[in-house]
């Protein structure tokens, strides 16, 4: 929570993944689908270890671990397939316990909700 010097306004900043929703497994499965589509076979445990990194960093780490070179063009395509595969799984995402109550409480106290992507 942050309070500005010249105002009584409050601001709350949440990292969506792991704070409000749990999407780890959906990301793992989406990355597996994307890497397989590029001909890169990886066990899910290897992908799971990299979750939390940006897509580019994750692909660099996986390339180092596997000794495979991934071009910028290939990386862009893999990330696009990941985004599409993840979107296909959106209906399986679940709000973490207490997250909705927290957001409702903030709304009841007239705390503005803003999205930052």
Predicted regions and their residues:
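Conserved small/polar residues in nucleotide/adenosyl-binding loops
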Residues: 114-117
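Short loop/turn motifs at secondary-structure junctions and domain boundaries
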Residues: 3-5
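N-terminal helical cap/lid subdomain that shapes the substrate entry/recognition surface
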Residues: 7-16, 20-100, 105, 109-112
């Amino acid at each position: 929570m942050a309070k500005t010097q010249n105002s009584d306004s409050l601001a709350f900043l949440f990292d969506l993944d792991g704070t409000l929703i749990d999407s780890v497994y959906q990301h793992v499965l989406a990355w597996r689908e994307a890497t397989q589509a590029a001909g890169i076979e990886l066990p899910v445990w290897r992908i799971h270890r990299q979750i939390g990194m940006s897509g580019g960093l994750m692909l660099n780490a996986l390339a180092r671990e596997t000794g495979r070179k991934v071009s910028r063009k290939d990386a862009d395509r893999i990330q696009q397939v990941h985004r599409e595969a993840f979107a296909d799984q959106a209906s399986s995402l679940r709000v973490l316990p207490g997250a909705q109550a927290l957001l409702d409480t903030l709304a009841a106290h007239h705390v503005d909700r803003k999205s930052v992507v």
